[in-house]
């Protein structure tokens, strides 16, 4: 399995050049993309130009960063100067940002290579990537199934091998759930640990950029590159940068892992339940202490999340009016122009969420819905704080089900929203979460396990995930077409 850390060694030892590696991944991408369709745009020329610079640095004997020369890809709601940032929407189909997101600046400092921008649910609103207005991305394990969402392109690209790593964004599970569906690692950092400057907003108090990778070590390496305080983001957490690779220790002895009974109730797929119970047994054998915890207010998390997220989306997406940038539909007057632009530019799910968000913020409903949801959010955060005073981590399924067929939930928004039931609490509480592969279903679809930690507890999270990965190599999953020939 091609990983960042293994390929870095090959580059440093001159077993392969950065140009050869980049060309190999581009060639592999050409084979899998006709089926997977993870990408919305390509940047091969820029990638090869950077690869040449990396090779020149190696030839001179210069030290290179772990990400230097390793081909990755970026979710299409993260701004890269002079490259499209469509958010998979007709509204921004022709938008090209004049600046880089802060995470891109940091990746450039590491001589990263991006092969292009990745598909997603429109404006990150969805859990299957079916809401993209520009492409249909398939799950690399079964082309008839969804890759999850909203970072479906990111998870599908890494799983299929058309990128060694990727960036996604997570508002209510949009990194972790597709990682679970595609059998890869997806990390949502603590809110504020990674700058949101240059991330096109869905819900600003919930959004967080994070890595999608093939193993836990790679997740730590990408997090090293993108995390840390950024003066351009007012919600960025101050403090010294952390080397997360120091946390990759194969040891969970005496670690207290909480298992919340509320996440194992009705609606949990029996095969998912079995895989997670086996994961719990693995941790017991490794010396961790398993503790039952209770998060009773988590049953309100999904309702509170959708009220808060849609209210913020309604506000954030008000800027797309056909005046400043993005799509513009001609009309006789300003009001008609704005109305037609928004009607034709936004897809059905985005329109639904704007409508609901505007409703909960309207006079007479603000107190009944939005204010109440904010109070529930505080209760959920307090519950997590209390739980983490007793345990080091919390273990749950990432999603209640494995991937499903295209169209299966497209006409039932509530059924799709319920796929986020295990992931949204972490966003409401602002805590870090990671999804790692925990097995396969009888229909040969990946199952993900989620670990949650206290705010800025990524190191413990990564240690526990790494230890599980080392103990269960059977859970490191690569689809039949996912291996790159080097």
Q: What function would you assign to each model-found segment?
A:
Residues 25, 47, 100, 219, ...:
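Residue-level signal for inorganic ion chemistry
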Residues 1-52, 285-287, 477-486:
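An N-terminal boundary/leader segment
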Residues 21-25, 304-305, 350-358:
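Short alpha-helical scaffolding segments that buttress acidic/His motifs in well-ordered protein cores
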Residues 31, 109, 160-165, 171-266, ...:
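Structural helix-boundary/capping segments
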Residues 8-9, 263, 298, 319-428, ...:
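Serine-dependent amide/ester hydrolase catalytic core
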Residues 67-209, 260-262, 311, 396-414:
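Short glycine/serine-rich loop/turn segments
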């Amino acid at each position: 399995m091609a990983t960042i850390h293994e390929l870095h060694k090959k580059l440093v030892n001159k077993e392969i050049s950065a140009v050869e590696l980049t060309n190999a991944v581009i060639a592999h991408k050409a084979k899998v993309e006709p089926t997977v369709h993870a990408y919305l745009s390509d940047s091969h020329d820029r990638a090869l130009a950077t690869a040449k610079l990396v090779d020149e640095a190696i030839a001179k004997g210069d030290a290179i960063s772990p990400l230097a020369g390793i081909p990755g890809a970026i979710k299409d709601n993260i701004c890269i100067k002079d490259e499209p940032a469509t958010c998979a929407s007709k509204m921004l189909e022709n938008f090209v940002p004049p600046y880089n997101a802060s995470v891109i600046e940091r990746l450039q400092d590491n001589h990263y290579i991006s092969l292009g921008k990745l598909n997603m649910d429109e404006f990150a609103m969805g859990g299957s990537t079916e809401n993209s207005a520009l492409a249909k991305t398939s799950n690399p394990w079964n082309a008839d199934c969804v890759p999850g969402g909203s970072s479906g392109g990111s998870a599908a690209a890494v799983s299929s091998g058309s990128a060694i790593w990727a960036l996604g964004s997570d508002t209510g599970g949009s990194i972790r759930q597709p990682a679970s569906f595609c059998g890869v690692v997806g990390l949502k950092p603590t809110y504020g640990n990674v700058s949101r400057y240059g991330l096109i907003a869905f819900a600003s108090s919930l959004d967080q950029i994070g890595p999608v990778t093939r193993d836990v070590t790679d997740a730590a390496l990408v997090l090293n590159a993108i995390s840390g305080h950024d003066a351009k983001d007012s919600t960025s957490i101050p403090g010294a940068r952390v080397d997360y690779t120091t946390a990759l220790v194969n040891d969970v002895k005496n670690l207290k892992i909480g298992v919340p009974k509320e996440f194992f109730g009705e609606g949990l797929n029996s095969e998912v339940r079995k895989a997670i119970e086996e994961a719990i047994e693995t941790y017991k054998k490794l010396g961790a202490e398993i503790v039952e915890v209770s998060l009773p207010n988590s049953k309100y998390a999904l309702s509170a999340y959708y009220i808060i997220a849609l209210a913020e989306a309604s506000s954030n997406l008000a800027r797309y009016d056909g005046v400043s940038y993005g799509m513009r539909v001609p009309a006789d007057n300003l009001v008609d122009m704005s109305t037609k632009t928004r009607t034709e530019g936004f897809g059905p799910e985005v329109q639904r969420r704007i409508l609901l968000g505007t409703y909960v913020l309207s006079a007479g409903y603000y107190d009944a819905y939005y204010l109440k949801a904010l109070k529930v959010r505080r209760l959920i955060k307090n519950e997590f704080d209390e739980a983490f005073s007793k345990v080091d981590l919390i273990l749950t399924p990432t999603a209640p089900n494995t991937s499903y067929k295209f169209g299966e939930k497209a006409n039932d928004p509530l059924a799709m929203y319920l796929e986020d039931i295990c992931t949204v609490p972490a966003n409401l509480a602002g805590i870090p979460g990671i999804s790692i592969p925990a097995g396969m279903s009888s229909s040969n679809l990946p199952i993900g396990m989620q670990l949650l930690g206290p705010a800025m507890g990524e190191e413990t999270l990564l240690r526990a995930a790494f230890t599980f990965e080392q103990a269960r190599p059977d859970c490191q999953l690569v689809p039949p077409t996912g291996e790159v020939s080097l």
